C-alpha cells in the first residue's frame, strides 16, 4: 500500500484541515491537479472550486476553496486559501440566496452594480452548491 501525503488547508482565520491523505485533487488555476506522496515539488495558484481528498481511511472528503495557493512537496500539500469550508459548514439556503442575488444583479445591469464582483459571487455560489451536491 502506498504511503499517505500530509494535507494542510489554512485560511487567514483558521486551520481547516490537517491530516494524512491518500490523494489530493485541487482546482489549480491551469486546471484540476492530483497529488500522491512523492509528487514533484511545485507551487500554483488556485481558483474557486472543490478541493477533494481521500483521508487515511479512504473516505472521500470535499471542501469549498475560494482561491489561494497550493504548495506541493513530496510528503506534504499546503493550501493557503482565502476561505475554505467543509461541506457540513455550508448553509444551503444562504448559498441559494447569494446565487439568486448575484443572478439578479447580473441580469439587471443597474448603474452602480459591479458586474465583475457579481459574477465572482455567482461563481462562488455555484461552486459551494456543487460541493454540497457531491457524494
From Swiss-Prot:
Subunit text: F-type ATPases have 2 components, CF(1) - the catalytic core - and CF(0) - the membrane proton channel. CF(1) has five subunits: alpha(3), beta(3), gamma(1), delta(1), epsilon(1). CF(0) has three main subunits: a, b and c.
InterPro entries according to UniProt: ATP_F1_dsu/esu_C_sf, ATP_synth_F1_dsu/esu, ATP_synth_F1_dsu/esu_N, ATP_synth_F1_esu_C, ATPsynth_dsu/esu_N
SUPFAM superfamilies membership: Epsilon subunit of F1F0-ATP synthase C-terminal domain, Epsilon subunit of F1F0-ATP synthase N-terminal domain
UniProt keyword annotations, A-Z: ATP synthesis, Cell inner membrane, Cell membrane, CF(1), Hydrogen ion transport, Ion transport, Membrane, Transport
Family: Belongs to the ATPase epsilon chain family.
Primary localisation category: membrane
Signal peptide: none
Name this polypeptide is given: ATP synthase epsilon chain
Keyword 4Fe-4S: no
Example of a GO MF term: ATP binding
Protein topology in the membrane: Peripheral membrane protein
GO cellular component terms, A-Z: plasma membrane; proton-transporting ATP synthase complex
Its job: Produces ATP from ADP in the presence of a proton gradient across the membrane.
Subcellular location: Cell inner membrane
Keyword Manganese part of the UniProt annotation: no
Amino acid at each position: 500500500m502506498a504511503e499517505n501525503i500530509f494535507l494542510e488547508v489554512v485560511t487567514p482565520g483558521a486551520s481547516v484541515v490537517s491530516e494524512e491523505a491518500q490523494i489530493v485533487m485541487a482546482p489549480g488555476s491551469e486546471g484540476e491537479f492530483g497529488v500522491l506522496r512523492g509528487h514533484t515539488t511545485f507551487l500554483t495558484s488556485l481558483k474557486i472550486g472543490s478541493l477533494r481528498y481521500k483521508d487515511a481511511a479512504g473516505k472521500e472528503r470535499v471542501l469549498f476553496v475560494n482561491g489561494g495557493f497550493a504548495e506541493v512537496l513530496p510528503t506534504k500539500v499546503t493550501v493557503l486559501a482565502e476561505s475554505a469550508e467543509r461541506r457540513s459548514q455550508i448553509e444551503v439556503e444562504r448559498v441559494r440566496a447569494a446565487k439568486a442575488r448575484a443572478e439578479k444583479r447580473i441580469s439587471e445591469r443597474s448603474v452602480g452594480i459591479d458586474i465583475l464582483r457579481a459574477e465572482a459571487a455567482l461563481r462562488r455560489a455555484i461552486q459551494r452548491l456543487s460541493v454540497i451536491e457531491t457524494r
